């Protein structure tokens, strides 16, 4: 429990932090990696270079400072971050390292005096304990389930298949021959890459792209321009290759009542978590609407698979948008609409009181979808989204 004095001091520093901007977290990361270079094996250095991680941490620090007297308002963010941390196998000792560099950063940038530093130390300690306890719960839950494990487990790539021009699926089975822990449709898998071509260990999270299977996991990865790990997986990971995986995690998952209509919306490789959901809804008691947007037929992943699912399950419906169809893309067969997704095409579904909407794709696409949902009166608590990479609010 934080003292009133600590709460007041931390809240009073919030405007100063906001004014400083991501310069605060840039200084923090530079300091931490200089003194603790081993942490480069944990953090995604690509997100450091493009500034996404600095921005995400800055937003989190400002949110904590502003809501320190209303911690329940942060529970959603805590859950999201705790799941991501569990995929990175974050430990309690690492929270101490981060805390020491955060306090040193505040001191070096602002020289606020010992009272402010003590207040931030107390506030950080409380927040760190919340994360440590929640992450321990996640670790124990994964370990205690059938097929579960804690830490890393070695898997072998047993199948590699291209789903479109840029998206490739990878199926992994455990080397020990055992079963694998179940997951909730929409969650992701942590993959650890150690290769001499990389200066540091590279860790990435990729959405599981199929329904639950007892002995394997499937991820489907888009080759990103300049993407170190995605290109490595496409070009160098072959059937028979071994990788180490962390157990499934993530707070974005299918959680709809059996009688609630479900709408799954995706763009590009954002279909990976929603495809896992679709495959898991074959026995659902209410209509399921699949909406997917992509550039054209060449980039349309899982086209035949989804078409077959829709044809064999009467409660499934599919609408596809191509942004720039090729000359051989057939409207009415390959896709139904061109241009940007217009949710008014399913307005009747979205007007149902208990509808649940799940969407994933580029941030701009998700902002566009969220805007339409709000304009159509869909309550915020009934739509759910996933950002690939550091979280952004849409």
Curated annotation (Swiss-Prot):
Cofactor note (record): Binds 1 heme b (iron(II)-protoporphyrin IX) group per subunit.
Entry's Gene Ontology BP terms: cellular response to nitrosative stress; nitric oxide catabolic process; response to toxic substance
Binding site for NADP(+): 268-273
InterPro entries: Cbr1-like_FAD-bd_dom, FAD-bd_FR_type, Flavoprot_Pyr_Nucl_cyt_Rdtase, FNR_nucleotide-bd, Globin, Globin-like_sf, Globin/Proto, Hmp
Site (Influences the redox potential of the prosthetic heme and FAD groups): 84, 386
Signal sequence, renumbered to the chain: none
Binding-site residues for FAD, renumbered to this chain: 188, 204-207, 387-390
Active site (record annotation): 95 (charge relay system), 135 (charge relay system)
PROSITE patterns: FAD_FR, GLOBIN
Keyword Iron: yes
Region Reductase: start-end pairs: 147-394
Transmembrane segments: none
Name assigned to this protein: Flavohemoprotein
Species: Vibrio vulnificus (strain YJ016)
Gene name of the encoded protein: hmp
